[in-house]
UniProtKB/Swiss-Prot annotation:
Forms a cylinder of 14 subunits composed of two heptameric rings stacked back-to-back. Interacts with the co-chaperonin GroES. It is an enzyme of class 5 (isomerase). HAMAP family: CH60. Its EC number is 5.6.1.7. This is Chaperonin GroEL. The lineage of its organism: Bacteria, Pseudomonadati, Pseudomonadota, Gammaproteobacteria, Alteromonadales. PANTHER family: 60 KDA HEAT SHOCK PROTEIN, MITOCHONDRIAL (PTHR45633). The gene is groEL. It comes from Pseudoalteromonas atlantica (strain T6c / ATCC BAA-1087). NCBIfam families: GroEL, PRK00013.1, PRK12849.1, PRK12850.1, PRK12851.1.
Amino acid sequence: MAAKEVRFSDDARVKMLAGVNILANAVKVTLGPKGRNVVLDKSFGAPTITKDGVSVAKEIELEDKFENMGAQMVKEVASKANDEAGDGTTTATVLAQSIVTEGLKAVAAGMNPMDLKRGIDKAVIAAVEQLKTLSVPCADSKAIAQVGTISANSDTEVGDLIAEAMDKVGKEGVITVEEGQSLQNELEVVEGMQFDRGYLSPYFMNNQENGTVELDSPFILLVDKKVSNIRELLPTLEAVAKASKPLLIIAEDVEGEALATLVVNNMRGIVKVAAVKAPGFGDRRKAMLQDLATLTGGTVISEEIGLELEKVTLEDLGTAKRVVINKDNTTVVDGAGEEEAIQGRVAQIRAQIEESSSDYDKEKLQERLAKLAGGVAVIKVGAATEVEMKEKKDRVEDALHATRAAVEEGVVAGGGVALVRAASKIVDLQGDNEDQTHGIKLLLRAMESPMRQIAANAGAEASVVTNAVKNGADNYGYNAGNDTYGDMLEMGILDPTKVTRSALQFAASIASLMITTEAMIAEAPKEDAPAMPDMGGMGGMGGMGGMM
């Protein structure tokens, strides 16, 4: 086992604070509408330019092991805020730096670290309650667009695009961000349920120009097994042919004789038919087939529940207004399922999301929920260069997370105003002893730090701005974008309550741990092994006299 180096008390804390400051100073320059860019070197390709706090934090790794521990703990603050609310990473970092700096000064002055921590915790609980009372619901498109704009570093186009996407697919809908092909940002909305399976044979195609299969008012047969024997499908095909309607078969697979017969029937015009594989795998496939059944008003034909393919009647088939299939995707538009059944299924999936502990499962369940409830919107980010594209895509994703958070818990005045107002409401809060009260005061001072940093980045005098805002009331604050004061909500400068709350809670949590640190242990740096000694000259061989 490698030797370890141990540092105690002030010796440890000074090193830790140095690491905190290096990381926080690099991150905090990005805060606010006039925040600066940070350039990140990449081992290959062009450097990345970003204004995203968590991207900057993730790049930082320090040589000194003890300083690095401090930096990594603040990096954790940014990551946690990002995971929880998708934004507020820079705010969280600025708060953490302020709490740690002030807290370690108090510890060095002889205060009890545990009492300081208790005071900080007490103040956080009170401040979060105040933020909740300051919160305003975020319901209309205008407010959603404003939140998106602020989070995307004052890019109004991004805010409007996200608001339009939410308008079209609903609050529950899935909105994804992709790299586009043009210079402009684009929004593409897929209505109905789309899944990533295309036609099983190109011979099903009936729109050669677009390379798609288009079925109007088709019957939909859902089968939870492989179909290879055409005899199993004959009763269904005959019934559908009599009804003179197209048929879509969604099964685990359709192969061999069954697929060949379907293709021949389709080409001869006996029955208009298409077949696709069911989406997903294993249990997820079963669940998605059931979703399709609920959406189209059909029944999943599964031998597990005693239903056989040969005995299918038209009542077992689902229907939809229109189905479009290309080589990669199938879209079912306007399924004929009952609204009540769909809402029941939606509620069931919501309950599963609440119970799930896996992020991957949650994401997949959220996708299923969106496909049932609204639809899917894709924001295609346009840019002139790849470097710009990456930076822009990061910003759009941030803005999307922020708007979701705003819809969830409402919004508060932006620009650090909400934290200052919440702090002013709990200024009389007292601890059980003097050290706890100092912990409370320390947090209240730290809650001003995001506003101070926004003002400093905009080239204003931080103390002047903070005093002016403190003397105002309600949502009165400083607009760093155009260097004016006024009502932040009216000016459209909003922060999601969830983002502000998460930033404060995570910053205080990790900063408290750092204040109460008494020892640090890291691997001792290895001594460089000395180089091999110089062998010097080999010397002469001397006279080898006497040799004949």
